[in-house]
Amino acid sequence: MSATALQVKTTQKPNSRLAVEVAVPAERCQANYEAAVTRLSRTTNLPGFRKGKVPRAVLLQQIGPVRIRATALESLVDAVWREVLEQESIEPLCEPELSGGFDALLESFQPSEALTLTLETDVTPTPKLKATKGLQAEAEVVTFDPSKVDELIEQSRKQLATLVPVESRPAAIGDIAVVSFSGTYDDDGSAIEGGSSDSMDVDLEDGQMIPGFVEGIIGMNLGDEKTVDCHFPDDYSKEDARGRKASFVINLKELKTRELPDLDDAFAQQSSDKATLEELRNDLEQRLQEDAKRRDRSNRHDALLEALTEQLEVDLPNTLVQQEIRNLVEQTASQFAQQGMDVKSMFTPELVRSLMESSRPEAEERLRRSFALTALAESEDLKIEESEISAKVKEVSRELSGERDIDPARLRQAVSDDLLKDKLLDWLEDNSTITEKVLESEAKTSKPAAKSKGSKTKSTKTKTNKANTEKPASDKSKS
């Protein structure tokens, strides 16, 4: 063994933390110290001496031995770490940390003596699955509901309706009321922040306002003033109002009703790009059927992924958890910005800390799902052929032909991840048992989303949409 060779001992710690103990020979320490002295003599400017010509004794006196030792130790630790990474094939997720800190190590560092130091870093964990086949899952079944076609058509009719003033009758469900109002809390009589308006349109439909508000307007005549008792829900957006009772003094200033367009071909042309009402209905039916298939497949895949994750054994590194938390907070900020909110003023340090704390469970769950897929691909040797990836990249590139700033490498990686995730979930579906369940909530179907390919049904399958966000974890990650 060379006199300058490093002796390395690695110890696995919790949270995928790796401790690396390194014994550095005295010869290596001395050589590094001498190199530091040489570098400092070349770069230090001292009065009366040319640059690079400062005598060693003068340099030690002017700079001081501690600074020189610190400079030598910094370069030594950096060089040792780079050599250890290559020697031990370690791929760190973050910068290393010195156990005990730099100052403590500096106190013990003597250039003429051997040095033992310990560096710690996070590394990518090796996920393992207790089982991959025969998993049991339960998923909510989603089926096409023909009545949703009529609901969507009625929504379009409302959007295209003509508002006609009403003067001869009281306010009724379905009307548009123009009101002024002011509200106070019942418990202390204080004014409700944002709880007043000189003129606001209120759609008199259930669920449009807090409980009691719309109900209180029903039956009022133009010019009437009425005090209405309301109750803020426990999950209301403003925390200080949650669960509190309130009173609103409401004045009915105007009342309008909707005059709906006739259900004919003219309506179809006005509300869509279809020429006839029959074409419109057929198009909506097709979109709703595709949406039901997409959501049903998403539910099955999400249930399967949940079942697979229950079989996972993995120690999540804090570096990846914090990175995923930041991603979630950034997504939240982006959503607020898209809604026109001032993110800079909203996202105070206190709010960011709160969001990061509350996002941790979701971040950990996302990572666990990603590692579960990674472990499945490794366990069952499931891969995507390069030809499949290339074909899909071409297809996506054509769809994005008008987009700018598309990174080909990132696009290819994203396509590869998506294809592999689909293949893994399809494999799971073929090798698992999924029990279907029908919930009453299925009656509340959302509007159709973008088209997606149909899914096969072999097994029988709970939850919605999480499976679309997880992809196999990358094999390698570096800081």
Swiss-Prot record:
Domain PPIase FKBP-type: 174-261
Major subcellular site: cytoplasm
Gene Ontology biological process: 'de novo' cotranslational protein folding; cell division; chaperone-mediated protein folding; protein transport; protein unfolding
Comp. bias regions, Basic and acidic residues: 468-479
Domains (record comment): Consists of 3 domains; the N-terminus binds the ribosome, the middle domain has PPIase activity, while the C-terminus has intrinsic chaperone activity on its own.
Protein name: Trigger factor
GO cellular component terms attached to this protein's record: cytoplasm
Residues covered by region (Disordered): 438-479
Entries under Pfam families matching the protein: FKBP_C, Trigger_C, Trigger_N
Class of enzymatic activity (EC top level): isomerase
Listed GO MF terms: peptidyl-prolyl cis-trans isomerase activity; protein folding chaperone; ribosome binding
Function noted in UniProt: Involved in protein export. Acts as a chaperone by maintaining the newly synthesized protein in an open conformation. Functions as a peptidyl-prolyl cis-trans isomerase.
